[in-house]
Amino acid sequence: MYLHLGNNVLVRKNSIIGIFDMDTATWSKRTRDTLSMVEQAGQMENAAGSELPKSLVICSLGSGQRYILSQLSPATLLRRSRSTGLENL
């Protein structure tokens, strides 16, 4: 099964490591530094388009990780994941 993150971006539900709220996740300097490093390395995907991202989804990708910004709120993504059978988030 897949979870739709917005703007035609889909991820496999079993690859999701976590869904984080961008409002609270960026309070920590350590988190901001990590996100900056990921973005500078070109590993950040923007599914939010021109809208302000509301959530960050981290997925496993082979031996690495995939970081995706979404314009959908974490609550919406969680509701969608549960309706598709992703109960462990």
Describe every region a protein language model picked out:
Residues 1-89:
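Eukaryotic intrinsically disordered, low-complexity regulatory linkers and tails enriched in Ser/Thr/Pro
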